[in-house]
Amino acid sequence: MKTHYNLRVIAARAVAQVLDQGQSLGALLPPLQAPLSEKDRALLQELCFGIMRVLPQLEWLLRQLMAKPLTGKQRPVHYLLMVGLYQLTYTRIPPHAALAETVEGAVAMKRPQFKGLINGVLRQFQRQQPALLADAERQDIRHLHPSWLQKRILAAWPAQYAQIIDANNQRPPMWLRVNRLHHSRDAYLALLAGTDIAAVAHSQLPDAIRLEMPCNVGRLPGFDRGWVTVQDASAQGCALLLAPQNSETILDLCAAPGGKTTHILEIAPAARVMAVDVDGQRAARIHDNLQRLGMQAEVVIGDGRTPDAWRSGMLFDRILLDAPCSATGVIRRHPDIKWLRRDGDIAELAELQRQILCAAWRVLKLGGTLLYATCSILPEENRGQIAAFLADHPDALLQETGDAAAPGLQCLPVPTSGDGFFYAKMIKETQAC
């Protein structure tokens, strides 16, 4: 990338790659951010994630401001206009600077003939902004979710629907997990206070701290030395519920990027841990996290559906299966999920989960424990999945983790607490039938 760049164009192109090519921001942004200054890295993330969060509103605004949509080869200008509207509505960038940089983006895109159009549309929005935004709040798009997902959430959680939608549309809190092998949580809170980082302890999770304001990990005391890890509170519940012991052989299945693997080793540093993921690039991040925390585990690239291909005959005392899922519990953290997922994906994911769960059960020792987890809030992937599994596996004894009337524990996203997550803990009682 050249030294001189137009950040608005980079953002517009990233948005296009998500919406037109189905790529995720999590994969797209790191290489785009690498050559940028810290300030511009943060701004690029704000623009891209923010646009994904409020996409229906921006699309609606453009329909009001333009006589006809930009299509075909003009589509990149459509996304550049989105970047302009987002800056004017949701950032503290001075309007004149936001407008000037966005207009100049047309030149950087080699579409200078659109400078006048971009300038005119954004200035018209500035004049009509209060009325347009008020009108947008009266439209169906105000929920900022695709209709299929709204219907599924409403059907599953009618009483909590508004809370879930609201939480999904907010910026996520930043949670830390203190490495108990280095510091107590209270000691680390004192270190944060000494660097003017305000934080509060979780009321139930022993290692969890929430920052009052998110910050760059470079500001966190001892981050590079493995004193602390960024991990949502709900995700921290996985290793705690698994309750690993030092003498055990433990499988972390679908383990990338390794946050739960390292948490297992913080709780049981003498355990033998195998971390398996089907994606080689994501598995490399497990190595990175282990190295940062000074830990060792056997990292394997393998398909959870075919454990005989990689387990070398091993059976496991405990298995953590953080199953691939719709990620509907972490939309606030990954708002592009709303536009990457399709209604038909849910049944396909549920079948994949079933296959991995059944395969994992086969390599669990008698008397062993399996914790099934997802970051979904949809019953087909969670309680429905576990109910079907229990019906097919009489050797599976469900451990009570939540509501006794339904299998498993379902957490919903809460603005100042954890993401949406599901857990079901099962013990293998007898020989399989």
UniProtKB/Swiss-Prot annotation:
Per UniProt, the keywords (alphabetical) are: Cytoplasm, Methyltransferase, RNA-binding, rRNA processing, S-adenosyl-L-methionine, Transferase
The enzyme class is transferase
The active site is formed by: C375
* Keyword hit for RNA-binding: yes
UniProt: S-adenosyl-L-methionine binding residues? C254, A255, A256, P257, G258, G259, K260, D277, D303, D322
The protein, known as: Ribosomal RNA small subunit methyltransferase B
Q: Where in the cell is it found?
A: Cytoplasm
Q: Which organism is it from?
A: Sodalis glossinidius (strain morsitans)
Q: Which GO terms describe its cellular component?
A: cytosol
Q: Which GO terms describe its biological process?
A: regulation of DNA-templated transcription; rRNA base methylation
